[in-house]
Amino acid sequence: MPIKPLIILPDPILREVSKPVEHVDSTIQKLADDMLETMYDAQGVGLAAIQIGIPLRMLVIDVSRNETQKNPLVIINPEILWLSDERNICKEGCLSIPEYYTEIERPKRLCVRYQDREGKQTEIEADHLLATCLQHEIDHLNGRLFIDHISKIKRDMVIRKFKKRAKEKNAQEAIL
């Protein structure tokens, strides 16, 4: 299972809306395995397929924080059924926006209908960290980033920083 390269801001692919997975088959299951390996390697708790350049409505999450007892979720074609009125503030980061963390307010609980790794339709009710991760990763599938939940001034600052970083990286690669 190969580790996939992560797409990093300001790459415009992160703003694409992902398309539904039509059939869960061995190709999709292999992609799920690759995504999990990539997420674990990057020490993340969630990863959307678009973050490795694949615009499919698919994500993986593992909030267990336990090296020995992993509890991965493979979520295909998620649909949010409801969000609670009660809110929660959680410090978020993103594998596609490395080394940037900020507090984001989101609904504390939600219910999501999705297909699992075998293609079986199921539902999950989640709260706290899992609810935050689900909302964060589903945002990715809709072309949204967690920085879209902060003020425009802060968001523009973050985008400028990552554009500058990408420009410097490209200039350095051109020299080599």
UniProtKB/Swiss-Prot annotation:
Binding site for Fe cation: C94, H136, H140
Family annotation (Gene3D superfamilies): Peptide deformylase
Coiled coil: none
Enzyme nomenclature, EC number: 3.5.1.88
Cofactor note as given: Binds 1 Fe(2+) ion.
One GO BP annotation of this record: translation
Record SUPFAM superfamilies: Peptide deformylase (SSF56420)
Name this polypeptide is given: Peptide deformylase
Organism in which the protein naturally occurs: Bartonella quintana (strain Toulouse)
